[in-house]
């Protein structure tokens, strides 16, 4: 299991921002900046149909595209984001970004992931947005390969830390929907849980430990959710698989600090998933906080219309990856 960190009690007080609020550099949503991009490259062959068009990457940061983090034999790649003119000898914290899509769909370069990566990179982080094994063929079993891929991403960033200018001891993760599930698996599972030592998986001699994790609107208790195609079995047929794929069952006091963000208007993954996770986390002594966003639906990035989440997310990562003291007020004003 993973090493505990300081509690977040002071991090999430619900008041308007003050002069103490951590500064967040202004950046327009990435999806609205197509005209500002100098380059546009076609999506890879594994990209879902909705992304079979040119991907417009931000020009405010440096992007290294389609890095073979799983080895040359795997089609799933990663994009590495770093600040412009970043001196690799000056190490920055790293953040793994994991897309959603129900474990069947999604891509590292969708608008949500571009938004998250650009905003966090502008705050002084090196981000690695990954593709991982998805279920694209009927009856195909893709779990636990998705978990192995997420752990391999952490190992790869740690392995290549000097090349990317990353502090190998300061790596966090953020994921949305299915990516939230994987982010929480990274925060809660360790060597005794069966995911860390796997034959033929890369970088087995390197730790997949993360220092902290953020999860947006994810299913974290699968046995109490619905049947998942990635298992190719129903909950009735294979309840143990669903339990093993649920980070709620690995919670304990040694887990990395976790922040969940969930909207009250989510009809895809109910808010009760995050509420149940928080309840068990408290019972087990895990360091977990839940931020509820009124009227927010299932899918949003760091800048939903309901509220600017950049101060919240930045403050969490700054505390656990940069050692900054959390302030009492970090919320941006909620939209009217």
Regions found by a protein language model. Give the residues of each.
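C-terminal catalytic histidine-bearing segment of alpha/beta-hydrolase fold enzymes
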Residues: 79, 140, 261, 271-336
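Short substrate-entry loop that stabilizes the transition state in hydrolases
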Residues: 86-92, 98-140, 181, 193-195, ...
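Short beta-strand/loop motif that positions the catalytic acidic residue
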Residues: 254, 260-262, 266
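Catalytic nucleophile-loop/oxyanion-hole region of alpha/beta-hydrolase
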Residues: 107-116, 128-168, 303-308
């Amino acid at each position: 299991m993973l090493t505990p960190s300081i509690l977040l009690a002071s991090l999430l007080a619900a008041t308007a921002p003050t002069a103490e609020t951590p500064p967040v550099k202004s950046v327009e949503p990435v999806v609205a900046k197509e005209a500002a991009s100098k380059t546009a490259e076609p999506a890879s062959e594994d990209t879902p149909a909705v992304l079979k068009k040119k991907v417009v990457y931000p020009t405010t940061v440096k992007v290294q595209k389609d890095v073979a983090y799983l080895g040359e034999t795997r089609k799933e790649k990663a994009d590495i984001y770093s600040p412009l003119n970043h001196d690799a000898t000056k190490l920055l914290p790293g953040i793994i970004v994991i897309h959603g899509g129900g474990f069947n769909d999604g891509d590292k370069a969708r608008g949500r992931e571009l938004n998250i990566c650009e905003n966090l990179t502008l705050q002084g982080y090196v981000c690695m947005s990954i593709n991982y094994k998805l279920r694209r063929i009927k009856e195909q079993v893709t779990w636990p390969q998705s978990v192995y891929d997420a752990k391999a991403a952490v190992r790869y960033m740690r392995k290549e830390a000097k090349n990317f200018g990353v502090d190998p001891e300061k790596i966090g993760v953020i994921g949305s929907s299915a990516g939230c599930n994987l982010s929480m698996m990274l925060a809660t599972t360790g060597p005794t849980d069966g995911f860390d030592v796997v034959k033929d998986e890369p970088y087995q001699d390197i730790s997949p430990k993360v220092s902290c994790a953020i999860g947006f609107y994810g299913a974290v208790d699968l046995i109490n959710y619905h049947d998942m195609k990635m298992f190719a079995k129903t909950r009735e047929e294979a309840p143990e698989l669903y339990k093993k794929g649920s980070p709620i069952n690995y919670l304990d006091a040694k887990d990395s600090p976790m922040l969940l963000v969930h909207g009250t208007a989510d009809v895809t993954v109910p808010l009760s998933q995050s509420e149940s996770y928080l309840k068990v986390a408290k019972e087990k002594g895990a360091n977990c906080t839940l931020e509820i966003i009124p009227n927010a639906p299932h899918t949003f990035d760091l800048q939903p219309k309901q509220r600017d989440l950049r101060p919240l997310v930045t403050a969490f990562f700054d505390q656990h990856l940069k050692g900054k003291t959390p302030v009492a007020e970090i919320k941006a004003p909620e939209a009217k």
